[in-house]
Amino acid sequence: MKVALSIVFLLIISTISFGQTTPPSESAMSRFLRYVKIDTQSAEDAGKFPSTEKQLVLARLLEKELKDLGVQNVRISQEGIVYGMIPGNLAANTKVPTIGFIAHMDTSPAVSGANVNAIIHKNYQGGDIVLPGDKTQVITVKQNPDLKNLIGDDIITADGTTLLGSDDKSGIAELMTMIDTLKQNPSIKHGNVAIAFTPDEEVGGPMDKFDIEGWGAKFAYTVDGEQLGDISNETWSARTATVTFTGRSTHPGTAKGIMINSSYAAGDFLSRFPAMIPNRPETTAGRVGFIHPYSTTMSEETSTIKILLRNFDITGLAGQEAAVKRVIAATQRKYPNVKIEYGSVLGYLNMKEVLKNYPQLTDYAIEAAKRAGISAQLRPIRGGTDGSRLTARGLPTPNLFTGGHNFHGKLEFNSRKGLEKSTETLVHLVQIWAERSK
């Protein structure tokens, strides 16, 4: 009899249609447009978390909104992480693991996120999109073929002078709308759902401080991906290298025979990359890793170049380090009087080595997307997420799509469909965990 009742229960909760639900009190698009107005750009090398105080403006807003939606145990940690828990509504004897969802509050330091002027291109009918604040910024169909799937949709961009902030305020808006939807529809059955919003994801933020035990999730998902349907259980393995050039400074008026200008050696080092380092971001795609000098500081006495090393294969990182050292050796031969030093730190490892042991995480996500009308596929991330580091710490955490495109640049965009379908997928996902668990 218990088995029969369980089957009936599962059939009931699996047949709830998202289209039959009571709508949330605020749409994902409306929330998104509010959140992008808040500048939350993080900063490299701040030496603290959060790296910028302005991230706490959004953290406090989310804290209030979570409490208003009835989320329990809402708190902001010393590092600026917002935590909360949505209690399950299943029978007491139903065993469903607590599932967590994470989105990050900061935007990339690469481009300004201040004074974002979001533009809604209603009922998009095809063609390139010229951004009105800087008409040299054009979202082209050639470089963005997914635009062909957005005919009739409302596309959201910035005006061409800033980031939009879709990375990752889309994820935040979608999670908040999921929470709202669950509140409005108690007939949607789910287990405990843990929520977290993190600072400084873009600059290697405080995931070593993330309170996994106190948060309570057994499995989690980051909501930090791009186009609809992209689900990721694989990221880069990542190191960050620093090359330091040390010369000798003196007053330029009396520098003859004395000054050793380190910036010349640093410039020579960079100039060798096109010939000696073929795999760079602008020359690679798919599963091919890259070496990327991304930050330089130069002076006569000391110059520093920071370099990203990225590879899906952990053993490939050693080869990339060797390649950088060959460039250093060539530069050293030309500038023997400049001291050149190399160092690197490990950022995160490809999470696939752990997640391959938990295929249900991505299987359930693919099924949830299917129920939302989205064809989903596993696609490796040419990047990293908070989930990379949480997975390494023992909390398996793949990544889900948000509908966004062109992260970290002025051509960033999302759409009404992207936001809504991502939200639907999240709602279906918590239902599926309730259905499939015993």
What does each of the following model-derived ranges do?
Residues 6-15:
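Bacterial N-terminal signal peptides
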Residues 264-283, 290-294, 339, 347-398:
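Active-site-adjacent substrate-binding region
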Residues 92-192, 421:
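Active-site metal-coordination/substrate-binding segment of hydrolases
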Residues 46-96, 100-102, 106, 116-117:
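A non-catalytic alpha/beta surface segment that caps or lines the substrate-entry region
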Residues 28, 260-279, 315-330, 364-370, ...:
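His/Asp/Glu-rich mid-to-C-terminal helical/loop segments that flank catalytic regions of hydrolases
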Residues 17-21:
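Boundary at the C-terminal end of the N-terminal hydrophobic targeting segment
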Residues 25-53, 156-157, 249, 348, ...:
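N-terminal capping segment at the start of a domain
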Residues 147-236, 278-294, 305-312, 318, ...:
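Acidic/histidine-rich catalytic neighborhood of metal-dependent amide-processing enzymes
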